[in-house]
Amino acid sequence: MDGEQRGRSDRPGGSPHLPFLSNPLMGDVVSDWSPLHDAAIHGCLLTLRNLISQGWPVNIITADHVSPLHEACLRGHLSCASVLLSHGAQVNGMTIDWRTPLFNACVSGSQDCVNLLLQHGATPHPETELASPIHEAAKRGYVKCIESLAAHGANIDYNISHLGTPLYVACKNQQVACAKKLLESGVSVNQGKGLDSPLHVVARMSSVELVHLLMDFGANAQAKNADGKRPVDLVPLESPLIQIFLQNEGPQSLRQLCRLRIRKCFGIRQHHKISELLLPEDLKRFLLHL
């Protein structure tokens, strides 16, 4: 409740006593879950301000190194995250499983929190492969988070051994909008997880829309994975994709080859660069896959 002074020291100017409380997100595990964490995760801004004014440290962490900022971002509470950062919260603090506030913001899908953290110096590049913000956003279908991360220099082709590229993750989770945004931004259409390409994974799932999308961006339908299988070899026999692959076995049209070559020359952030070309609108729309 707002105004409640749990754990406040009775001494004037004294530091608050930090009790051990049960973290509701950790089951029966007991951790140093503080009222500050509780206010942050529930978005109780007034309570958060009161606790900070009473002397609660904004960088107090649980046994798992979870900070109030982690919790505010996990639930997408922008105002709480802003207050914590303005009082010195560590923007790149990591939990014991390597999660940063930025990773948690991508879990919640809050572009506002992502932008706030990046503006305060959050790094879009994870220190380990275990908690990549851009992969998490791709997995959950948060296009806006991907846009913000890419705009701040995140590697949109970041290849993690156990996950693959963001495009591969988006395709595996059938996040069409994210896959399209990544392709429009200039990712490599054939980079996936090891020798398993994005086209392999969508063929395996018999996703017609994603197969069309990847082929439209030049996916190699003849590439073989570690088992020597082409994407068409992974398609269920009853799937209509069999016919689609057969229709695309021949060479690509000159028009398609020209589009792919032009887009490759522009590299990343292609939409912005192509839009500024002095070309007829119809041609620009073709280059942009619109």
UniProtKB/Swiss-Prot annotation:
Domain (SOCS box) ranges: 236-290
The segment annotated Disordered runs over 1-20
Q: What gene is this protein translated from?
A: Asb9
Which subcellular locations apply to this protein? Mitochondrion
Query: Pfam families, from UniProt?
Result: Ank, Ank_2, SOCS_box
Q: Where are the ANK repeats?
A: 31-60, 64-93, 97-126, 129-158, 162-191, 194-223
Q: Where is this site: Essential for binding to CKB?
A: 103
Q: What is this protein called?
A: Ankyrin repeat and SOCS box protein 9
Subunit structure of this chain's protein: Substrate-recognition component of the ECS(ASB9) complex, composed of ASB9, CUL5, ELOB, ELOC and RNF7/RBX2.
Q: What are the GO MF terms of this UniProt record?
A: ubiquitin-like ligase-substrate adaptor activity
Q: Name one GO biological process term.
A: proteasome-mediated ubiquitin-dependent protein catabolic process
